[in-house]
A protein has these predicted regions:
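Acidic-glycine-rich active-site phosphate/pyrophosphate-binding loop
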Residues: 31-42, 117, 228-236
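Short, glycine-rich nucleotide/cofactor-binding loops
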Residues: 34-39, 162-166, 243-248
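Short, hydrophobic/aliphatic alpha-helical segments
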Residues: 35-51, 149, 153-155, 301-318
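Solvent-exposed alpha-helices and their adjacent loops that cap or buttress functional pockets
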Residues: 2-4, 11-15, 27, 50, ...
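Positively charged, low-complexity intrinsically disordered leader regions
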Residues: 1-41, 45
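N-terminal active-site beta-alpha-beta segment that forms phosphate/nucleotide-binding
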Residues: 49-214
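Short beta-strand segments
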Residues: 23, 61, 156-160, 235-237, ...
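Conserved phosphate- and dinucleotide-binding cores of soluble alpha/beta proteins
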Residues: 185, 193-318
Length: 318
């Protein structure tokens, strides 16, 4: 992740493996803030509060949650508590349960005294694998999207599936970064993505760091942009993909898919294998969907004229 002129990952282990460093995504785009997580409870809280978010990153963060917990208590009871607390932190993203099961199944088979070292090895391995997968997604998308001429490529995306949703590179934005690196003129339409504004707060911030041209649009503007021929491709990430290809993603994704189909515009979902729910093949309406606090619709965070970050009410829900 390029921030200014320095590369970052969204999550990294400290050298002595006593804590992990994360980018506090709730502070963006107003402040770039690194915080340290030292305990299982802090990891669970960071996932629930969306200080870390994005399906792939949540999974890797959970793996580090095991490692931090094993530093204090590597017993079977501690291991079971880790699994239960982490898998219930946010239910929609299947990457979370995938990573939790991967780490738990490996640790439960080994002696307690070996679990600390192994848990850190597993977490770091999952983090590195995530980066490798995202680079591969970027290359695959690049080969799909690269034009035969040097015209501007206009791509619409919803929510945030860039660096901040993964350990690095991103899923849906990875092909965009690759196109830009190869010299193509790329312009991105960025949905604001209400109610938490991940597009406005995170995707636009990422693209700004990379110097990629972009325009933030209201969530309802996508249809008109497609109708007017101003969108060449739509690409999004995913929280969960069923075996038959059904996709669960941020609210509003379905509307973009329907309009893209109506206007004969290619619609792509970029996701690693860990986002595929191999145990699910029924109706997508039966996916467990996270229901968040209604106050997220009625409030919005912003910066006032004095540079203070404040939260304002947008209306009265009563």
């Amino acid at each position: 992740m390029l921030v200014g002129s320095k590369n970052y990952r969204t999550i990294e282990a400290s050298e002595d493996q006593s804590y992990v460093k994360i980018i506090d995504q709730t502070s963006l785009p107003f402040k770039f803030k690194i915080i340290h997580l030292r305990t299982l409870d802090e990891v669970v809280r960071a996932i629930k509060n969306m200080q870390v978010r994005g399906a792939p990153l949540i999974g890797v963060t959970a793996a580090y949650g095991f490692a931090l917990s094993m530093n204090f208590d590597s017993s079977d009871n501690s291991l079971s508590k880790c699994k239960n607390d982490l898998v219930n932190a946010r239910p929609t993203a299947v990457n979370l349960s995938w990573a939790v099961n991967q780490v738990y199944d490996a640790l439960i088979k080994c002696p307690s005294k070996e679990r600390v070292e192994l848990s850190w090895e597993l977490a770091i391995k999952l983090a590195n694998q995530d980066v490798e997968k995202n680079i591969s997604i970027g290359l695959h998308g690049y080969n799909l999207f690269k034009p035969s001429n040097k015209k501007t490529i206009n791509i619409l995306t919803h929510c945030n599936a860039g660096w901040l949703a993964t350990v690095d590179h991103g899923t849906a934005l990875s092909p965009i970064f690759k196109l830009f690196d190869e010299g193509f003129d790329v312009h991105v339409w960025v949905d604001e993505t209400r109610p938490r504004n991940q597009g406005l707060s995170l995707t636009a911030w990422e693209l700004s760091q990379y110097k990629i041209r972009h325009t933030v649009v209201t969530d309802n503007a996508g249809g008109l942009l497609m109708k007017e021929g101003l969108v060449d491709f739509v690409i999004v990430g995913a929280d969960r993909v069923a075996l038959d290809g059904q996709v669960c993603n941020k609210i509003g994704t379905y509307l973009k898919a329907v309009v893209a189909k109506e206007n004969n515009i290619p619609f792509y979902v970029a996701a690693p294998v860990s986002t595929i729910d191999i145990n699910f093949s029924g109706e997508i309406r039966n996916f467990e969907i996270e229901c968040r606090d209604p106050s997220e619709i009625m409030t919005m965070k912003g910066e006032d004229k004095l540079g203070n970050i404040i939260e304002v009410n947008l209306g009265n829900s009563t």
